[in-house]
């Protein structure tokens, strides 16, 4: 049963590998959007350089209703254990933690924050 459907424009490169995801909706001042997108790519590269199996992607909503003025940021890990370990490392001062702080500094407000376990569903239609 499909519980949610919508359209999104990918603003940063990523490979669709559903798994355990932190999903946030953020408001960014228009003049900071480019810097924010760049900062997400810097963070992802720093995490991968540190050996993390992680992806970070940013999407703009199409037909997003009341959340149409926000960006969706999805951080992808293979499972909950991996995601939890990354949070522990980040709070302990991992080499990439300053890149995370720099990215967060460009966020004006967090509109929504959740952890989701996602999968791709194929239909016969």
PLM features: residue spans?
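Short S/T/G/P-rich N-terminal loop/turn motif that feeds into the first structured element of a domain
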Residues: 1-125
């Amino acid at each position: 049963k499909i519980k949610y459907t919508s359209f999104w424009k990918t603003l940063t490169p990523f490979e669709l590998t559903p798994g355990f995801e932190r999903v946030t909706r953020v408001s960014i001042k228009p003049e900071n959007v480019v810097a924010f997108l760049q900062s997400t790519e810097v963070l992802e590269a720093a995490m991968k350089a540190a050996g993390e199996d992680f992806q970070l992607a940013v999407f703009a909503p199409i037909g997003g209703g009341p959340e149409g003025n926000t960006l969706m940021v999805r951080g992808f890990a293979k499972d909950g254990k991996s995601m939890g370990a990354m949070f522990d490392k980040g709070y302990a001062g991992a080499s990439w933690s300053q890149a995370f702080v720099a990215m967060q500094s460009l966020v004006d407000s967090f509109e929504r924050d959740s952890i989701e376990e996602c999968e791709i569903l194929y239909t016969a239609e």
